[in-house]
Amino acid sequence: MSERVPSIRAEIVSVGDELLKGQRVNTNASFIARSLGSVGIPVVRVTACSDFESEMASVFREALGRADVVLVTGGLGPTRDDRTRKAAGELLGLGLRLDPDALREVERRVTAHGRTMSELMQGQAMVLDGSRAIPNTRGTAAGMIIPAGERFGGSHLVLMPGVPVEMEAMMELTVQPWLRGLSDTTIIHTPVKTTGIGESTLADMLPDIEDSLPEGTSLAYLPHGAGVDLMVSTIARDPLRAERDNAAVVEAIRERAAAFIFAVGTASLEETIIGMLASGGLTLSVAESCTGGLIASRLTDVPGSSVSLMQGFIVYSNSAKEELLGVSRGLIDTHGAVSEEVACAMALGCLRRSGTSIALATTGIAGPGGGSPEKPVGTLCLAIARQVPGSGPSVGVRTLHMHGDRLQNKHRFSEAALRDLWVALRGEQGG
């Protein structure tokens, strides 16, 4: 794969001791990187630094020497440890001025809360000489776009608050449109989402595709608990070429790994399942023991799920399995509550009592107790029953073994159940 150096390079600097101490997660950098990618500007480095002015100035100097645009978050607030303006001003030899539009916005917000304007609050409207103020529609501290001058080869320094909602509004309303005017490239990111396959196994399926990627196209593996997301990224000056090259790689991956791909795009597995149920005119019910309602919860997170998900049973105790689903006591005594026989009975009982097209049932041992040599912690019995026109219900079942603590096992159980449900729905639709 050959790579082309982009015309504009960006760096992100996140200011705050709380980041270095692990007291906050740096979600700002992720948001900014995605925003930059959408306008064809790649991020070449992300740095976190302390609130000390000397440290900030050093980081800003190095970043401006490497990148065309340096985006900084944090240190614009009214407290003593908010020193980003001063550090940037001293580095660039720029003084501060009061921006009248920013001041009016600060005054409006302060008086709206019944407070009196203070010198510290007025400082929120201070911007560096020669900069363009960035309005803060969600807070008080103004941001700024600062030309760094010939000393730094015409690079720009962009200062924004560290409060995520304030920074995000600035990026979307002001910074992103400004950046779009700087970039002469188009970048396309296409997620390809898989389930039921590990990273190394998937990579073994795609070596020739990776070896023949078009110029400017890259393939990233993003593993997670349920599978691996692939990100196909293409950057090119010609928008039509970017779309063509990206689509060709995505299609090649789809043909090679079709059995594991549930979505091309941003849809989650839950969204995909609800969409398949709705498009097929199918209804679903769930009977959960070890997952305790987690499967139903995940499915109902999807808007419009009420069209397809009809009913759920949380049958944690043996008596609940008997009373709500009609599982016989003899079956439980003979095989145990965690068994394929009981899972099948749960799924069939759920199907019968709900009247849905498909029923899903889980019974297992999440831990930390309850395991045995024959049925260790992490054992899951998973059954899916369905109505077969003209021949009555059918049921399929399998046993899986997970390794994790209680919460990890519950999540993995739900992932396995959703994955099997997706596979079953593909069979219903001839996929």
UniProtKB/Swiss-Prot annotation:
Superkingdom of the source species: Bacteria
Pfam family, one: CinA
InterPro entries to which the protein is assigned, alphabetical: CinA (IPR050101), CinA-like_C (IPR036653), CinA_C (IPR008136), CinA_KH (IPR041424), Competence-induced_CinA (IPR008135), MoaB/Mog-like_dom_sf (IPR036425), MoaB/Mog_dom (IPR001453)
UniProt cross-references to PANTHER family, sorted A to Z: NICOTINAMIDE-NUCLEOTIDE AMIDOHYDROLASE PNCC, NMN AMIDOHYDROLASE-LIKE PROTEIN YFAY
Stated family: Belongs to the CinA family.
UniProt-recorded name of the protein: CinA-like protein
Origin species: Chlorobium luteolum (strain DSM 273 / BCRC 81028 / 2530) (Pelodictyon luteolum)
